[in-house]
Curated annotation (Swiss-Prot):
GO terms for molecular function: cytoskeletal motor activity. This is Flagellar L-ring protein. Disulfide bonds: none annotated. Its main location: membrane. The basal body constitutes a major portion of the flagellar organelle and consists of four rings (L,P,S, and M) mounted on a central rod. GO terms for cellular component: bacterial-type flagellum basal body, distal rod, L ring; cell outer membrane. Coiled coil: none annotated. The lineage of its organism: Bacteria, Pseudomonadati, Pseudomonadota, Betaproteobacteria, Burkholderiales. A lipid is attached at residue 22 (S-diacylglycerol cysteine). Residues 34-53 are annotated as: Disordered.
Amino acid sequence: MMLKTVLRLPVCAALLALAAGCAMIPPEPVVTGPLTAPPPPPPQPSARPNGSIYQPSAYGNYPLFEDRRPRNVGDIVTIVLEEKTNAAKGVATNTSRDGSATLGVAAAPRFMDGVINDKLDTDISGGNTANGTGKSSANNTFTGTITTTVIGVLPNGNLQIAGEKQIAINRGSEYVRFSGVVDPRSITGSNTVSSTRVADARIEYRSKGVMDEVQTMGWLQRFFLIASPF
């Protein structure tokens, strides 16, 4: 009885390891790193007198005639998502090969009479033909808006931006993540910039919940899909 129990333990452990290997693997995120960068607390400035027309306290850190476009860590930038890609590819391959050979023997040994009729003529021919075609196409469209935060300023003045938007509806949730590098001169007066003008742009749109689970193949199906040789 003890021997049977000892033998069953490795089998159970192997089955558990196999089931764990077939478990659902979460997708790797496209956008990595911090998604927001709260600015450090500014030093306490000395009290400034307020005039009768212009009051500095009402404008925060922005002077009266300063451009309001983002330039510091912690400023926000609205990204207008305008991504559209179309790709198509076609491949065709045709190959053929023919060959032939003839072998003749004028006379054969007497003990083989009646079998090959005193003469051996052999013709060999062969052919090989292969045809292959393939086509692939992809169309993607992604539109919307997301407000990001400046998380860093490069030495040349370009801004590193990143942001995330999460939406939870009933039992499911969706999130959009964005990161990249933008030139401050590309930002419009309304504090927006098109995603097509962002360098090193990384856009991630995923969902969690019932709809995501429905679109995922079960672990047992994945096991048979991997183990099946066909």
